[in-house]
Amino acid sequence: CYLFTATQQLDESLDVLLGMVTHPYFTEQTIAKEQGIIGQEIKMYDDSPDWRLITGLFECLYHEHPIRSDIAGTCESIAAITPEMLYDCCKAFYAPGNMVLAAAGNTSMEQILAACARHGLMDERPAEKVERLLRPEPMTLAAAEKTIAMPIAKSCFGLGFKEEPLPFGDLRSEMLYELILCCICGGMSPLYRRLYDEGLTNPGFGGEVLRVDGCCCILFTGESDRPDTVRQLLLDEIERVRKEGVDREIFTLCKNEKYGQLIENLENVEDSASQMADFALAGQTVAQQI
């Protein structure tokens, strides 16, 4: 996703953006420069406890899915990148049928369409058919647990649950996952208050749902000196909710909070544009999601 904001010269800025994605330019020299920068970023992430925790969870949850691999690659893999490889990727993916251009603010549809026309994005052209070849992924776990030793003040921990992949455009199920997580361990839940009051976790403890093509999982992460205790309390709460259901009052609060967040994003120009693009790529509109 490419983002920019502008207070003036919007047409010129759009021309730079659309020119970049429609007519990319790669050389051995520019690639070598970026390889050095990305290599430093990879090493930086290797020193991040939070990042190592998440990648460790993915390695435990999945046997074959590409989510096991660090999205940035490795210093060895990026060293093999060539201009021809990047041009092939652009030809396959940087096609109008795969693009979403979202704009918010003091502009008009006519101005945006004119920018697209200047770069040939309004011309009819056959779409490149790209098929992602994913290896079969069993629903079993690749590993039950993993420990990573790092020199940090307080230990990070994560607990993951592997779920069946969601169909494309099924934002309703994703929203239900988020509401259930809010009811189980959100800031208004009894479990969150207990863990925080007893000093078992940090304020950043929480759960999230992650879904990509062929992958869906629930992740709980935080900091704790007693991760095994937190894990058991979390499992006990999940089992209680399975048997008794969610508290109606907490569910209403969580639903209103989520609704409020969606509305609040419409008050911010940058958030509005990002939200429109995200939902469009998922096959829906902001209005449908709300």
Q: What do the PLM-derived regions correspond to, one by one?
A:
Residues L171:
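Short glycine/threonine-rich loop/turn motifs
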Residues C1-V130, K154-F157, E163-F168, L176, ...:
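Charge-rich, well-structured scaffold segments of protease-associated domains
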Residues E84, T140-L141:
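Short gly/ser/thr-rich secondary-structure transition/capping motifs
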Residues L179-C182:
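Helix-start/capping segments and mature chain N-termini
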Residues T5, L141-A149:
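Short amphipathic
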Residues L134, P138:
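Double-stranded RNA-binding/processing signature
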